[in-house]
Amino acid sequence: MRQQFQSIFKIPELRKRILYTLTLLIVVRIGAHIPIPGIDSEVLGAAIRNYANTLFGLYDLFAGGAFSRATLFALGIMPYITASIILQLLGSVIPYFQKLQREGEEGRKKLTQLTRYGTVIMTLMQSFGISQFLMSPQMSARIGNQLLPVVPNPGIGFVMMTMLSLTTGTILIMWLGERITERGIGNGISLIIMIGIIDRLPNVVVSEIAMVREEVRGIFTEIVLIGLMFIIVGFVVLLTQGQRKIPVQYAKRVVGRKVYGGQATHIPLRVNTAGVMPIIFAQSIMFIPNTISTFFPNSNLIQGMMSFFSVSQPVYWIIFGLLIVFFTYFYTAIAFNPVEVADNMKKYGGFIPGIRPGKKTSEFIDNILTKVTLPGSIFLAFIAVFPYILMKVMDINYDLASFFGGTSLLIIVGVALDTLQQIESHLLMRHYDGFLKSGKLRGRH
């Protein structure tokens, strides 16, 4: 393993990509600590504790703690993800967007531009809602003998400044994510979410150590939780790496005096082709009711309806699990096109033994992919709702439960594996050993 890490720094391009990625991630974390103007940080810190186990607390997890601090990056990358989901859903039903999806690189550029415009619109809406929420009467706390508001000077000036600050922050974080994807290593959006989640881990560990010392929680309970975490990590790795191999045979072709083809290969169908995207997509959808509620902070009806979407309610987790199953199939259909694979195989003389080339091949691949995706999506949903089971069975808060299963753990493990696979690809291209499997090509020294 040490040799593999040393190999990274022997490849100039890979070294530059990693350093570039780390630099931009540091910029993201700095932005997550710069507060928007007009906020009393001390009062905010006291007032936000009441929302730790609600959807606000979960949103804060995705924003890397920036939401609870009301910083420039308080909205995180979620408006961008929501805009992406809307455009991809529109691509399934509206001919114009379907046409853009088929236009290759030019269509992709147009969709990216539309996603950016959508992100700005979503950010303006959410930032207005947050400004109303911060100015609401419930966002106050007792400091000493005084009940103080989070916003000392509410009004149109604060609303405009909040909208400008949060919109600028979201556009910047979106741009940083795109730069990481293009010029760094890994998926920029996923890495930004992952680094925000990891940022909260030290506080959780310190809190648990304090609880054990104060005998609030027994050491046996902590050992069980740690054991569960390792078991779940193992299953998540198996889920991410597991695949079904479909054998493919290429017919021999004679071109001039040369013989081409004749070799056997396979199509790897991953159990979880969609990766962590279904979780991120499902979570962003679950945040929509929360966003709507910020527009009506004083409405008892809206706030009462929001109680059903609390992370402590089973309704929230049932809907969340079903959304994960749906988005697993939805994103798999986008990421893997059986018709395109079958056409390419037919074009180059490839076929699946016992299956006729063309339409029959695409139907066969689609059938196998559907069967493989089903258990993967169900397991993904189960791991995502596991924190609710922990909260009920072991009486722990969501912050802790999320690190021993659920969204946080799935994103951390999934993004880490995806990034390692990209690093491994760079190493193998230059004949160095990879991280994830033994027996790779040796470096030529």
Language-model segments: which ranges?
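N-terminal cationic and glycine-rich segments that engage phosphates or anionic surfaces
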Residues: 1-101, 105-445
